[in-house]
């Protein structure tokens, strides 16, 4: 069993989740993910790693409460335990001196892109971080990014903080301050990663996205997380989760995600979250 050190809602519907897992914290790297279960009957949920403390033996993730199993996670308190905390899984993000790197995070991806930005800065890169949200009340960890970035940009749809607009305005925004990235890394919801990949492709900006499909075992056996990259079948859990965003068949990926909607809804119906229906 794995002890919960902290579980708190940091912005509406997003929770910071800190678990005592010494073996995982000892070997985890930026870009890795873990799989958890809230109880013996719960689904296996893949969560990107947002931070870790090797001395304390803890691992931090940011998760969104969207279904029955994440609702169970959201009810956990410090001192509670969970039966499953598997990791680190997946390939770590490539870290080296690329030159100028743009790190874009939205929603739960703000958390998962943080250790990537930190490691890239430590590798000698110029790191420019962009945090994107619908409104200022959905932003978090901005102070952490200032410590690991040469500059932090904020974009909100309603203009309550930073630049008013959306990710489609990023190229113009960077052009105005003379920034041309050698590498762009995007962590967030599927639409954000897809849209940013579409924006950067004609510009020739190499773009790496952190894919988050449904998974079961996390070791490539179930095949649920497969996707087409460069015309070849890949498994997000073992070949990724990082992939070249310009090579992903986004239309196929979105269709596969939709096919699991009934199975995702059913656990929520059977949970105690009847208020959703």
Q: Where are the regions a protein language model picked out?
A:
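Short, Lys/Arg- and Gly-enriched loop/turn segments at beta-strand edges
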Residues: 42-51, 89-99, 237
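Short Fe-S-cluster ligation motifs
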Residues: 235-239, 243-277
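A generic structural signal for residues embedded in beta-strands
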Residues: 36, 84-85, 227
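Local cysteine-cluster metal-coordination motifs and their immediate loop/turn environment
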Residues: 112, 212-242, 271-277
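Short, surface-exposed secondary-structure boundary micro-motifs
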Residues: 39, 87-88, 230
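Ferredoxin-reductase
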Residues: 1-80
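Glycine-rich beta-alpha junction loops
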Residues: 23, 40, 134-135, 213-215, ...
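FNR/FR-type flavoprotein reductase catalytic core
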Residues: 68-216
């Amino acid at each position: 069993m794995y002890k919960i050190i902290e579980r708190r809602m940091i912005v509406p519907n997003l929770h910071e989740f800190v678990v005592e897992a010494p073996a995982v914290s000892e070997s985890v790297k930026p870009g890795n993910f873990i799989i958890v279960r809230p109880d013996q009957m719960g689904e296996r949920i893949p969560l990107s790693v947002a931070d870790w403390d090797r001395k304390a033996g803890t691992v931090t993730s940011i998760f969104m409460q969207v279904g029955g199993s994440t609702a169970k996670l959201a009810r956990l308190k410090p001192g509670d335990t969970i039966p499953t905390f598997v990791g680190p899984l997946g390939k770590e993000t490539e870290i080296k001196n690329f030159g100028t790197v743009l790190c874009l995070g939205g929603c739960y991806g703000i958390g998962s892109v943080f250790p990537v930005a930190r490691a890239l800065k430590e590798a000698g890169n110029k790191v420019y971080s962009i945090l994107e949200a619908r409104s200022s009340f959905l932003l978090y960890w901005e102070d952490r990014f200032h410590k690991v970035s040469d500059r932090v940009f904020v974009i909100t749809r309603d203009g309550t903080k930073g630049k008013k607009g959306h990710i489609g305005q990023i190229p113009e925004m960077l052009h105005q301050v003379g920034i041309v990235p050698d590498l762009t890394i995007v962590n967030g919801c599927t639409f954000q990663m897809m849209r940013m990949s579409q924006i950067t492709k004609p510009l020739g900006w190499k773009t790496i996205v952190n894919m988050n499909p449904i998974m079961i075992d996390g070791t490539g056996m179930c095949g649920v997380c497969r996707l087409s990259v460069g015309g070849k079948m890949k498994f997000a859990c073992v070949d990724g989760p990082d992939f070249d965003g310009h090579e992903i068949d986004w239309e196929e990926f979105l269709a596969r995600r939709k096919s699991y909607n009934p199975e995702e809804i059913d656990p929520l119906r059977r949970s105690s979250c009847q208020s959703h229906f």
